[in-house]
Amino acid sequence: MFSQLSTNFYPTILQPQTVHRGTAPPNALPAERAPCLIGRPVHFAHGPFAGRTIRASLDEIQAAQLGRKYARVDRRPLDPPPAVRLRLFNVYNAGTEQQTEEEFEEYGDTLGLGFVCTLDLFPLPEGSSCHRSPGPYAEPPVHRVGGCAIYESEKATNALVGSTFVQPTCVTFEGRSTLVFVFSDLAVKYEGEFLLRYRVFDLFSLPRGHRDIAIQAECYGAAFRIYTTKDFPGLPPSTALTKELARVGVRLSVRDTGKKATTKRRKRSDSFDEDDSS
């Protein structure tokens, strides 16, 4: 089992040249020149998967549905807590017509050592901005939601509050052990509709021909809404997955029944919102 680490920890150790330069070959490429490996089979030169070709995938198994706009005094995390599953595949004869892959049979705490998931926040376009005409040098979209394009330049990750880098927890999901990244304390500073992009990398593994740690997989989550305190509809009962995560040690609030905001709580929180905006 792994505890979630603070966001302040990772910017220090995510200096791939510092971590790996002693073992990287002299002709290895730095991150800005190396090919993108997201979602592709990766042959590892160093680390626990050295000599093997591995493909990683992420999928969101629990999406946030709603949240209250962050205030310094009254921070309420997204609900339910967003969670993504990591799947790993051994790849054989990569890059040939005989390429095949086989998912790992066992997932456990030891296998999860070194894996870290991080995320980014994107606002959903509203109204006419959803159908804007691209300019002659327009950037390509990174994702689409209901016909609306999402662009990297619109990323609003600095509006997130909480742990944006987490390590995996091993839980039973769909009848088998699974490595799950849980973002249990995220809040958003602004109201509106948003989605999350999840990305995973392995701190202890270095791809062949690379100097830097590589992002191995990514996925985009479902849209969710952030409400003002006045408009917040309340919290539904906790999901079965949330209860299972809490049972195995992830720090989460569990509710057997829904929780609606009372008038008294709304009035008190409104003053917090005003304090936060000052």
Swiss-Prot record:
Provide the induction entry: Expression is up-regulated during fruiting body formation.
A single Gene Ontology biological process assigned to it is:
sporulation resulting in formation of a cellular spore
Q: Where in the cell is it found?
A: Nucleus
**Gene3D superfamilies (alphabetical):** Velvet domain (2.60.40.3960)
Q: Where is this region: Disordered?
A: 257-278
Q: Does the keyword Transcription apply?
A: yes
Which coarse location class applies to the principal site listed for this UniProt protein?
A: nucleus
Concerning Pfam families, the annotation shows:
Velvet (PF11754)
Output the PROSITE patterns linked to this UniProt entry: VELVET
What does the UniProt keyword field contain?
Nucleus, Sporulation, Transcription, Transcription regulation
- Which family is it part of? Belongs to the velvet family.
Role summary: Velvet-domain-containing protein that probably acts as a positive regulator of sexual development.
Name by which UniProt lists this protein: Probable velvet family sexual development regulator SCHCODRAFT_28806
Natural source organism: Schizophyllum commune (strain H4-8 / FGSC 9210)
Q: What is the lineage of its organism?
A: Eukaryota, Fungi, Dikarya, Basidiomycota, Agaricomycotina
